[in-house]
Amino acid sequence: MIIIGIDPGAKGGVAIYDEAEHKMILHKCPETPKEMAAIINTAKVKDENTFCVIEKVHAFPTDARSSAFKFGCNFGKWLGILGAYDIPTLEVTPQSWMKPLQPLPKVKTERKNQLKQIAINLFPENKITLSTSDAALMVVWYVNNE
């Protein structure tokens, strides 16, 4: 089975985990729907039995309207591509997938850096970045909770 983790923000990333090979492939979130689809296609071609966990996101009242709109558009593009490839998808809140990793810092930059370090410890063979760490950890959360 292939498990895809997606952090749909513009600075997010994609993690593709092959359970049979115990290998993780990471991508920074692509800029175009064509590039997004290419990543999903690669996973689906490798194994028809593919599942996705995507971070369920929403805009905050403090977000600028244009950035909130872009954020929502990116999320919608991912859902559309996953639907077109007929990939079952679970939307998970950040609170849910981060819960087993608590306690985490309240300050966003500190929390992001700690999440990155956790992912590096779990996947030392991969080049984990701030862009890809959340996606990788969502895959771990799914595997541990399926």
Which sequence ranges carry the predicted segments?
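Phosphate- and other anionic-substrate recognition elements at nucleic-acid/protein interfaces
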Residues: M1-E146
